[in-house]
């Protein structure tokens, strides 16, 4: 190295350090050779080698979702760059900072149809918050700093393509800087007291209020719960916000639509007033969720979101938790009401049903009993990396979460195969916490080669695989919409043996009588530093479809209700309308 000089790749790594980056995920390649040379000599940033670039991208995105620094993943020019796309799109749709670094042929080979040359930047147009190709070596650290600043400030993915020769070139060591250490904490806008007072007046006059609490209030669960108790308003929450609340809070109705609970899917149509806190319910229009709502109050930190899902009677720009506290301080307390009592009864009826399924002690193994064992043996502050489909749906129903936990997935993009990559990142940043990757066999089939990544880097996690040889969530959808259940079944492998072949510990379990002991042993081995895969061979029993309930005799025949209850083992479930009538109220949704 020439005195007073530094390679552009080494300068780039120094910039990344100012942004808190300690890990780069990826696979080495020729078009990343200058970066790999710099990483080999760097003492602070670890290169975490994955078996597929998509795993690296998703791990980097989930790193930020779990509260870590901006995640960084690299891909070779051409194939590697295309493999990063899933991570880029998940970051974009979940408003998550992420930096994708793309390798590229040397600059003198570009536009010459060289080996693996691809016009890469257009792939990310329209989705990346920053998308550039480095033009010369001195520009490299500056562009990386710009990319990180854009990703963090705009909460999305940034993409940088680097011709490989630039990274080898030397630049002046004082010709660059990184801005990641500068104070940039976002200060929420001051709340508009006029709008707060409007909201308070609306809630004071509401007869059937509901709080719809989104992820914007994930750190304000205690305040939102206190507000719920004070005004006797049940809480609907979004799927990714369950950790904000105590799972057994009597006023929690769960989430609405398909990935949800029965109570939430009923109460949303019965409420006259909705306090929409930090949420962007994507099924609102499709589901006509608020068609019976008379008054709608929305709080959001993003002015674009205000009014997106419903016409507003009070519009509050600001932090959801701060707004909830401001309303809590001013709103009138409410004694127990028929509306509240009906909701508490409905919630308990649903929990009794959940507990019955979870507590079975004999018969074929279902996913419900697996969750029961997890709840029994998981640490109180366990981290859950959750895959999509039935796993998302059922984890929100059956995991007994509290604000001590973290639960993350791909909620809007819903890309299958995200749980295992997420667990890599979660364990890397939280080495002293227990990490569970919970997924179906379809998701595990997409990413199981990276079980060995946990083994290689001593990142012990527990992989829980619900194995029933089908794409269950899609099959269930086809059951409601299609003539044929086509293309949804597949042949499974022995996942325990796959785990063992990668240096992990594998278990296979297919009996209710054995699940508790298997999970207990898996937890014990995990605490001893082992990565574990549990192949839980469950039935193909469909979880109850809360979006198409057939329980109310005013809507369905006696035969249809009987068949529905038998199919879903739901003999004790009662339609919300009957609880309302017990309290002297009439349904607004069912006439």
UniProtKB/Swiss-Prot annotation:
Q: Which residues bind Mg(2+)?
A: 441, 468, 470
Class in the EC hierarchy, top level: oxidoreductase
Positions the record marks as coiled coil are: none
Alphabetized UniProt keyword annotations? FAD, Flavoprotein, Magnesium, Metal-binding, Oxidoreductase, Thiamine pyrophosphate
Q: How is the cofactor bound?
A: Binds 1 FAD per subunit. Binds 1 Mg(2+) ion per subunit.
**SUPFAM superfamilies given for it?**
DHS-like NAD/FAD-binding domain, Thiamin diphosphate-binding fold (THDP-binding)
Q: Where is this region: Core?
A: 1-188
Record region (FAD-binding): 189-336
Reported function? Important for the aerobic growth. Decarboxylates pyruvate in four steps. The energy released is partially stored in acetyl phosphate.
Describe the family membership recorded for this protein in Swiss-Prot or TrEMBL: Belongs to the TPP enzyme family.
- The name of this protein is Pyruvate oxidase
Q: Which organism is it from?
A: Streptococcus pneumoniae serotype 4 (strain ATCC BAA-334 / TIGR4)
What is the organism lineage in this UniProt record?
Bacteria, Bacillati, Bacillota, Bacilli, Lactobacillales
């Amino acid at each position: 190295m020439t005195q007073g000089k530094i390679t552009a790749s080494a300068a780039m790594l120094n910039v990344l350090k100012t942004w808190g980056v300690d890990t780069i995920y990826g696979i080495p390649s020729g078009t990343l050779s200058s970066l790999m040379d710099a990483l080999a000599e760097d003492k602070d940033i670890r290169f975490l080698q994955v078996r597929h670039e998509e795993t690296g991208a998703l791990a980097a995105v989930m790193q930020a979702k779990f509260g870590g620094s901006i995640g960084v993943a690299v891909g070779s020019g051409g194939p590697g760059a295309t493999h990063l796309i899933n991570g880029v799109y998940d970051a974009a749709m979940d408003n998550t900072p992420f930096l994708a670094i793309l390798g590229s042929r040397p600059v003198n080979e570009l536009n010459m149809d060289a080996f693996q040359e691809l016009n890469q930047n257009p792939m990310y147009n329209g989705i990346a918050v920053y998308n550039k190709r480095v033009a010369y070596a001195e520009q490299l650290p500056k562009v990386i700093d710009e990319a990180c600043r854009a990703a963090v400030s705009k909460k999305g993915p940034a993409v940088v393509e680097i011709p490989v020769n630039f990274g080898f070139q030397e630049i002046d060591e004082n010709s660059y800087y990184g801005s990641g250490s500068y104070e940039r904490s976002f200060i929420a806008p001051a709340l508009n007291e006029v709008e707060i007072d409007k909201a308070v007046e609306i809630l004071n006059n509401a007869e059937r209020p509901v709080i719809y609490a989104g992820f914007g209030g994930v750190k304000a669960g205690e305040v939102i719960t206190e507000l719920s108790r004070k005004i006797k308003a049940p809480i609907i929450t979004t799927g990714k916000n369950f950790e904000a609340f105590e799972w057994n809070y009597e006023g929690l109705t769960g989430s609405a639509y398909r990935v949800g609970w029965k109570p939430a899917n009923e109460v949303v149509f019965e409420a006259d007033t909705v306090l929409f806190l930090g949420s962007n319910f994507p099924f609102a229009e499709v589901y006509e969720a608020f068609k019976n709502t008379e008054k709608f109050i929305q709080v959001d930190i993003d002015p674009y979101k205000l009014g997106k899902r419903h016409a507003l009677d009070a519009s509050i720009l600001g932090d959801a938790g701060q707004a909830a506290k401001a309303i809590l301080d001013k709103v009138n307390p409410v004694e127990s009401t028929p509306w509240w009592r009906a909701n508490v009864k409905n919630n308990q009826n649903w929990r009794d049903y959940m507990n019955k399924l979870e507590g079975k002690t004999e018969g074929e193994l279902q996913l419900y009993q697996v969750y029961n064992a997890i709840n029994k043996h998981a640490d109180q502050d366990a981290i859950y990396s959750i895959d999509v489909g039935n796993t998302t749906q059922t984890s929100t129903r059956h995991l007994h979460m509290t604000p001590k936990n973290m639960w993350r997935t791909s909620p809007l993009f819903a890309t299958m195969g995200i749980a295992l990559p997420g667990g890599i990142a979660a364990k890397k940043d939280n080495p002293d916490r227990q990490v569970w990757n919970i997924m179906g066999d379809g998701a595990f089939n997409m990413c199981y080669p990276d079980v060995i990544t946990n083994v290689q880097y001593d990142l012990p996690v527990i992989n829980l695989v619900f194995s029933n040889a089908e794409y269950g969530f899609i099959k269930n959808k086809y059951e409601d919409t299609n003539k044929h259940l086509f293309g949804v079944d597949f042949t499974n492998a022995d996942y325990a043996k796959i785990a063992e072949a990668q240096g992990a510990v594998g278990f296979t379990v297919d009996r209710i009588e054995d699940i508790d002991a298997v999970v207990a042993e898996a937890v014990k081995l995990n605490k001893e530093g082992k990565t574990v895969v549990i192949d839980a061979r469950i039935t193909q029993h469909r979880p109850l479809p809360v979006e198409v309930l057939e329980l109310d005799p005013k809507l369905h025949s006696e035969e249809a209700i009987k068949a529905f209850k038998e199919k879903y083992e739901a003999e004790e479930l009662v339609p919300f309308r009957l609880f309302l009538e017990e309290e002297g109220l009439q349904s607004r949704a069912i006439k």
